[in-house]
Amino acid sequence: MQRAVLIRDYVIDHLGEAFSKGYIQVYYQPVIRSISKTLCGLEALARWIDPVYGFLKPNEFIPALENTRQLYQLDLYILEEVCKRLRACLDDGIPVVPISINLSRMDFLTCDIFTEVERRTQKYRIPHHLLCIEITESMFVQNAREIRIILDHFREVGYQVWMDDFGSGYSSLNALKDYHFDELKIDMDFLSNFTQRSKDIIQSTIHMSKKIGIRTLAEGVETEEQFRFLRDIGCEKIQGYFFGKPLPFDEMKAHILLQHIDVETEELTAYYEKAGDMDFTTDESLAIVETMEDGKLYFRFASPAYQDVLASVGAPTPRDSEARLNMPESPIRKKIARLLSHVYDSDQPYAITYTIDDQYLWLKVQKIAQLGKRFLLRCKLLNITRNAIQIEQMKVNGLEKDLYDLYHAIVINDLDRGTCQPVVFCRDYHKFHPGHTYCYQTTMRAFGYLSIQKEDRPRYERFMDADTISDRLSAHGGTLSEYFRTLTPNGFVWCQHVFIAIPDTNCRIFLHTVKPAIPNNLAMEKGLVKLYNEIKKDW
């Protein structure tokens, strides 16, 4: 207790001396982008290294300065040093990333903080996007209206405003409701015991933030397990001892080099932020893949469902799939390269079907972002063969309800031979049996007569027209989709009919899948009828 009192009195009386003699130093802690492990930011933190008392912890000097209304002097000193550092780096051609500084409630009450910040950024010619303002929810206990006006002013001229320690207090959600923030810094005390409940809270926070357009950063990350969890739920940025503790600038720089962490440029930041806009919390098959200048592919994210498909064809992890895809003579690589040549030149998704170990896989890819010859891609992968096997097993087990949640039919069609071969038929047709080959035209007409509602048959016949299918598939990247009311054990319901071209066949061989589209209710039917009346104008 006596030491604490002595330090408090010492700090109050020696602040000016600490500034002039360099006892107070700025330490920088790296902020890492989760999907790329690139350096995307730094936080500036005050450290007091005293000749009398040694290394003072922040909680040994900040409360004393706050109680004596001197804290604004410390914050402005840190701001000045950060601006000096940024200007020196810019002048020397050293890559820079945005640096965040902490402002306290006292800064807003004891000085014109906006003018003070502007004065220094103008003095050192610092672009506003390189400086981020961190505040805590305690800022809004009093004078909330005046503080909000100042924060809005910061944002209007290009500074980012972040909420620090989100979740550590009791009014975080109220602050989010009433104020505009560019980023949330999530307090990792949530994960101190790493229970499922704490994970669920973090995941919900990430999902909410993406929905309202706020970026996320988790601070206090210390383990590989925490990092992987946060990356996989879509938390964009990571800060903590796992990637590096706060250090003087030159030591921090050396640490980053030693860890082989690349520094983001402004262009790279904008590029990766396109992926950060996506919601990773999905049960669907989803992957984010990056293709580099040398043509190699790297998984930046893969959902459990996507990894499950990879494992079904002998790639237990995304890294194993990378190795297969990046082999120069890999036939799969060549097929996917042809697909990507279309994806790179368009904002539309493209899809192919290919085989691995006698299993049909369907891959859909869409461009998210481009930086020169680097691309971020959104991918969806399905194992059609395995799904078909699951369907057949469900039939054996009598699981009709689950069965109809998957596929009504899967058929392989060969236009050159004029044949079709059912892989799956969920209903029992005495004329069509999986594993047998039939005439395409005869089957198409019979299926239309038996299974398509009368009013939809003209559209169905145009959709199934063998003379135009190849051209239509080619024009739409290898996939076509349409909706028809199709007969099921529950009567006629809206089903999605999809054509998927088999690669290297000039769209002459394709899969035809049929699956229920939406719940069969009157309101939705009326909506679809209206939609189709509009679509008919383009036929």
Outline where the language-model segments fall.
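PAS-family sensory domains
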Residues: 291-346, 420-478
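Sensory-domain boundary/capping and coupling elements
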Residues: 171, 387-399, 521-539
